Amino acid sequence: MQLSRAEFDARYAAGTLRIAFVGMSNIGKSYTVMRLATKYDFNLIEVDKLIWENLGHDSMDAFAEWQGHPYTDGYSEREAHSISLETAATRKALSTDQRNPMVDTTGSVIYTDEDVLEMLRRDYYVVYIEAMADHIERLKVQYFKQPKPLVWAGHYEKLEGKTETESILECYPKLLKSRADMYAKLADITLPSTMILNPKVKIDAIYEALKPAV
């Protein structure tokens, strides 16, 4: 949803500003929306939480363990089920009537049903946190330290002469690259991860940066 800076501010004051954040997991998205919702007049809706609560899990770690890695038995079926759950949870989140909703979407929101993506484009000001080159390696390491549910969408393959772990680390940057264009097509504004993850950047500066330029 394209907005002018004046429209952004007017909607915020009226309580009708709808913002959604998109981007890869482990890039500071959830931390940033939490900071914004704490400092400003936003109601935070976490789609991840809606999903794992629906599955009866009590944490993201439990959800990640359930989904597993793409080389584990039954992953394709769990991936398809996960996308179905994400579609339903995202649709529910976007349909909220709360004041100034700020929706923290899943990293795989781009694979949800078309009607959900249309809701995002039509009804929400979409902020994309782009993973910059300096953070790609960190994302790979962090993914294995704390694996979040991740839809591979056919981008994983077992590489000749590589272990499963080595293969997934090789394929992960390709997955990030394939997703980048899809996130960008949804976005109304893009913020670099170098800004989001810089501890010297105050939340006020991030809030001003995500507003329309004019």
Predicted regions and their residues:
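Walker A/P-loop
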Residues: S30
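NTP-dependent small-molecule kinase module
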Residues: M1-G15, R35, K39, E166, ...
